[in-house]
Amino acid sequence: MKYYPLLLALLVSGASLNALSTPLSTQQAQAPGYYRMALGDWQITAVSDGTVAVPFDKLLTPITPEKLKARMAQANLPVNAETSINAFVINTGKQLILVDAGAGPLFGDAGGHLPENLRAAGIDPQAIDTVLLTHIHADHSGGVQREGKPVFPNATVRVDQRDVDFWLNPAHQRDVEEGQRHTFAESERSLRPVIDAGKLSPFYAPVQIMPGIDAIPAAGHTPGSVIYRVSHAGKTLLLWGDIIHAHPVQLPQPEVAIHFDVNRQQAVATRENVLAQAAREGDWIAAAHIAFPGLGKVMKAEEGYRWVPINYSAQGK
C-alpha cells in the first residue's frame, strides 16, 4: 500500500487535467436591468428595456463620416453602437409613475424586457398608476401593449396631445421622411388598446402632471415631445426622452440632428437650450438612450458638453 499516495496523486492530477480540457460554458444573459437612486424620500428606479444597435453613420446629420468615427472612437464605440433603451419609475410613496414604456414587441428580442426587469426590481406592472410618455415613438410607447392588451392595465397613459394628433393621423405621413412612415402604423398598434380601454389621457405642455412633476415642451424630435421635470426635497431630475441619441457626438456638437427628428431645426434648438440649462443648473438627468442606467449630469466641456454618469451606489442613494 506504500504506492497508494502516489497513485492517488496521479489520479487526482489526471482528473484535474480532464477538467481543464473540458470547455467551460458561457452565459449571455446580464444581471436584471434596474438601478435605484434617491430624490429626497422619493425613489427613482432606472429599468432597462434592452439595447439595440443603431447605425449612426446613416442617421446623424450633418457630420462627416470621419468626424463621426472619431467622435464615437473617443467613447470606445463603433459608429453602429449598441444603444440603451431606458425607462424610469418614480415611487413617491403613494404612487408609482413609469416614464416611457420601452419598445414592447416592436424591436424583437432587442427590446421588450421592461416588464421582466420591473418584476426583478420588485415592481408589479399592475401596480403602476400612471405611464408618462415623453413622446410617441416605438422605443418609448411600443411597450404599453402586448398582444392587443394594455401591459399596465391599471395605469392611465399620459402624453402630449400634439403627438397624439400627429402620429394617430395617417394624413401626416407626408410630413415625415419615407423611412419614418412605419411609425404611424406602430403608433396605432401601440396606443389603440389603451384608447379602447379608456386609459389614454393626453395633455398640453407646459402643465403640472401632479405635485412635483411637470411636463415641459421639448418639441422638434416630435411635435409633442416633452421633458418631465421632477422636483422634490430641493432636488430636480429631468427625464429627457430623446434629447440625445448619440452622446459622444451630440454633447460636443448639439447641432447634429438625427433623421428621426420631425423638425430638425427645432430639435437642435431644443437640445441646445436643454443642454445649456442642464449644465447651468446641475440637475440630475434621466436619459433614455445613454448607457444604462442613463442617470447622470451634464457639464460644460472645452467643446460643448460632457456626460458625467452617476456614481454607483449599492445602497441606491
Locate each region found by the language model.
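Active-site metal-binding loops of divalent metal-dependent hydrolases
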Residues: 49-50, 101-104, 136, 162-163, ...
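N-terminal signal peptide c-region/cleavage motif recognized by signal peptidases
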Residues: 13-16
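Metallo-beta-lactamase
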Residues: 19-115, 119-123, 127-141, 234-241, ...
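Short, conserved loop/helix-junction motifs that constitute active-site signature segments
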Residues: 148-154
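Bacterial N-terminal signal peptides that target proteins for export
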Residues: 1-7
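Cap/insert and terminal regions of metallo-dependent hydrolase folds
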Residues: 108, 227-229, 233-317
